[in-house]
Amino acid sequence: MAKAKFERTKPHVNVGTIGHVDHGKTTLTAALTKIGAERFGGEFKAYDAIDAAPEEKARGITISTAHVEYESPTRHYAHVDCPGHADYVKNMITGAAQMDGAILVCSAADGPMPQTREHILLSRQVGVPHIVVFLNKADMVDDAELLELVEMEVRELLSKYDFPGDDTPIIHGSARLALDGDQSDIGVPAILKLVEALDSFIPEPTRDVDRPFLMPVEDVFSISGRGTVVTGRIERGIIKVGDEIEIVGIRDTQKTTVTGVEMFRKLLDQGQAGDNAGLLLRGTKRDDVERGQVLCKPGSIKPHTEFEAEVYVLSKDEGGRHTPFFKGYRPQFYFRTTDITGACQLPEGVEMVMPGDNVKMVVTLINPVAMDEGLRFAIREGGRTVGAGVVAKIIK
């Protein structure tokens, strides 16, 4: 059969497998690529190829992640699978592989285990919007009542962390049988049912270009006779000449109008997400804008100083701290383009945090930063990255 050419016409959705060690995440990933390749195009990736995930660096943190792709009738999926629990924690906190939805793999024989819970909690903290469940190893459970019991436990766990437990699709199956081509209900058909659930339950993500305009300020220039130009990479949305924008963060919010959009020293009518652009601002002085602020669509993002975060602290081997830190720790928090000092408040009963740990903390910054829940940041000490985090909840 001729190899199907990759068509960009299908919408692209990012997913990944989460769940306890040895519950079958990688086997399921292999089964998805195999059945996807047979039915809808794409290429089969064997278990061993996925399991030998290469190490990559994201923000100075070493993470092993396997990336595979498969198709459904209507979509193209990019799927991440991590070999170890620590890789999941790092991956989710750094946002190295952003997920529009996750496939929670839970063994029907064992039921929910500690990492099942931890991955659901992490998904909530880092803003994974949707979870679909695959109850794996269903061939090892003869008792239908036991299956129902495990399903109930998983639903309760999802609800506990504010996912819609009662409405979540839960598919029973065996990834191993499906890989072997088994045609019984829990074999290949279960994988097809899972793909259907992904298609229907995980909404298509809003493309960056369709979201409200935002550009982090990287540099500010004053051009005589023309005014102030602010440069940066447009993170989301579209900006046109004549648009009103706000300058948010660090100091009081100001309003201004964009009178010019430049790229590669050419004047354009508009810039969009992904472009490196220079924006000419009307009546704005060079000292009114600084690195660390953002330009945005008015009202679309607010400045905040206090938030709850989920943080991964780099291990010594990753170039992080060699010693733990305690409450009252005051490092710099690097948001988008700048460092802002902040104080850390640790959870009750946590006296210290060791390199290599992940922890929930409340951070109070000395200056406000434009932020939404889900924004990633680095923790630095004198320019050296010692941690990575994500804004889980804004307090004020």
UniProtKB/Swiss-Prot annotation:
GO terms for cellular component: cytosol. Residues 10-206 form the tr-type G domain. Residues 174-176 are annotated as: G5. Residues 81-84 are annotated as: G3. The keyword Ribonucleoprotein does not apply. The gene is tuf1. This is Elongation factor Tu. It is an enzyme of class 3 (hydrolase). Residues 136-139 are annotated as: G4. It comes from Xanthomonas euvesicatoria pv. vesicatoria (strain 85-10). HAMAP family: EF_Tu_B (MF_00118_B). Residues 19-26 are annotated as: G1.
